[in-house]
Amino acid sequence: MKTWVIKIGTSILRGTEETSTEEVIENLSRSFTSFLSKGNKLILVTSGAVGLGCQKLNIKTRPNDLSTLQATAAVGQVNLMSLYDKVFNRLGLNIAQILITKADFNSRESFNNASKTLKRLIDLNVIPIVNENDTVANEELKYGDNDTLSALVALAINANKLILLTDIENLYSKDPRNNKDAQPIKEVHNSELKEIKDKNIQNSNNEWGTGGISTKLISAEIATKGGVEVQLVDGTNKKNLIEIFNDNKIGTLFYPVEKPIGNKKSWLSHAIQTVGKITLDDGASFAIKKKGASLLAVGVKNVEGNFTINQAVKIVNTNDKEVAKGLVSISSDKLRSILNNKENNNSSIIVVHRDVLALS
């Protein structure tokens, strides 16, 4: 049995002058009926609420102010789920709406609860349709058009594959719309991905979405580090949808690492929000990166922010480059007290245990 997550971008769902949003959803749903009939499982991560809300309210360009964005998302979400329900019901498919914000993944308990709910839904042969809760989330509208969320969902349910449907055929060496010499990139191994991502080799400047190719590369990095294969595919081509579910190699394939970091450390690395920062000396940085050691107080040079036990912090080296994230074993006040020599014989105290420390 396979479990796949499919992220459908705004640029796909808005359709064209010839194809309505309902027809787009119809084409997609018909393409995976055979996949589901074999006992496989599917979760959709959908964008499009803001875009559809703007259509409904006759707003011609994507709003810039938060209140209008949230208002159009509220209107569009109703329309979006109505279309999904209408189309999927015709095919005898049951769906469920799941609205998520960053805060829902911020604690281990809530992350696990979301994971259990999603897994139970697919066990019941229900297709969960996940979207960010744009109506109440402010930071969420800058999250990357659901790209990052789709990777976290894939990790939460231990998916085999994450498919990113977009409006380009595959990843390119340059933006093909502005560079005639742009070369398609068909395969990317995890060891190559960070360099490609950091170069930000291409951006898709689509006003209706909040993400471009850069957010999809971030999503691919998150998923592949957690052991999930990622496929970037042009979802505007109906033939591609059929090819995907025949498991054919189209678009760009991002291969997962051979030794995934695991569900818990994936959560630490990508889902949790940090509340402070700890700067390490060179020795401590080497020890946690190369030896898998816990972070001890003796290796700490500086502390920023206020945090209590079990809150998440960013861990950086002397050049302020992120080394890891982790959950602290002591408070910021206690750690500052140790650094200021107000307490003796505490330099070997564990600040972040290696079991709750995830390398960046």
Swiss-Prot record:
Annotated Gene3D superfamilies: Acetylglutamate kinase-like, PUA domain
Domain PUA positions: 275-356
Origin superkingdom: Bacteria
GO cellular component terms listed in the entry, alphabetical order: cytosol
Residues given in the record as ATP binding sites: K7, T166, D167, T210, G211, G212, I213, S214, T215, K216
Keywords: Amino-acid biosynthesis, ATP-binding, Cytoplasm, Kinase, Nucleotide-binding, Proline biosynthesis, Transferase
One Pfam family per UniProt: PUA
Binding annotation for substrate: S47, D134, N146
Subcellular location field: Cytoplasm
Reactions catalysed: L-glutamate + ATP = L-glutamyl 5-phosphate + ADP
Enzyme Commission designation: 2.7.2.11
Known function: Catalyzes the transfer of a phosphate group to glutamate to form L-glutamate 5-phosphate.
Stored NCBIfam families: proB
Family: Belongs to the glutamate 5-kinase family.
Stated name of the protein: Glutamate 5-kinase
